[in-house]
């Protein structure tokens, strides 16, 4: 039951994160948003995610992991209803913000639960469970595209109906969680590593930087790839969503198959190799143009490994402070997500206006530059991983 809750939790998490790709162009059209406003919207929602990350570990110690997990799924169902009812941009923004509160709570809860359960073969099991996120992410864009064109009793679902339908799937892990018994926190209060001690460890700060740049590069694909392909290359929505699904297929297969490699060659070396590969694929796709667009999908192989590998590293390095270390790292990662999404939208708008705001070439150059920033984040992730590798090798603390 514990594993079923984790696996279903990551499936729902993947749906909620990645149905936005096909929906964003429609949302943008309905509310008449430019790229800068769209970036701001995604940043504000990342802020909701950040806020949730900051209090979820505290609630876990107060209420227990079971209640917090159920509450996270409940918030996501509620947000779906509010998104469906939203008829103005402020109401939609608030509803979307609430969904990211649920996402943040769920991410911390699943990470803590995984760290408590998977004490052996940590890298393999973390990647396996996160692989279920990839599975749902693979089909999410195609399902979202299909649902938006479905009519129920003569009424088109559109993006509002699609959101409420997909987020209602959260009821499934709730049912499993209600019947499950979850491991309690067995670390005594006096044995727990204090936050101040963790904050003095520069290795944890490197993890924050690596995770922040890696996750911005990962999550930005779900928000911007379909938009990029539809506007820059004039792809149809189904074809563009298919490329996003191909990205997540590569993403999923990498997590399901390559997890044991991280345990074998080491977590930090894995971070260097995989983030570097993702950066090369992204830059290659942009420079090569439409004929090399398949490299956008191939980039998923590399970026998929960053988050679970960082979680595995934290679980191994801080066995008596895993909850605190995860919360600290993921919360600051949320700050990076807010800034990253805002910068992507801002860069696109800035370059587009500089080249020609009303021209096709201006839009293409803006989107290329914005997507180039996504590749740059993966490259920076690789650089920080390499620096950390040198530090830990010198201290003989490589994991």
Where are these regions (language model features)?
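Helix-breaking motifs and short loop linkers at transmembrane-helix boundaries and internal kinks
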Residues: 32, 64, 85-90, 119, ...
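Extracytoplasmic gate region of multi-pass secondary transporters
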Residues: 20-21, 201-248, 252
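Conserved MFS/SLC helix-loop-helix module at the cytosolic interface between two early adjacent transmembrane helices
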Residues: 51-90
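Helix-to-loop junctions at the C-terminal end of transmembrane segments
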Residues: 52-64, 254-266, 348
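Extracytoplasmic
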Residues: 2-27, 31, 221-226, 340
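Helix-loop-helix hairpin linking two adjacent transmembrane segments in secondary transporters
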Residues: 120-121, 125-182
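Cytoplasmic helix-loop-helix junction between adjacent transmembrane helices
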Residues: 95-131
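C-terminal transmembrane helical hairpin of 12-TM major facilitator-type secondary transporters
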Residues: 265-313
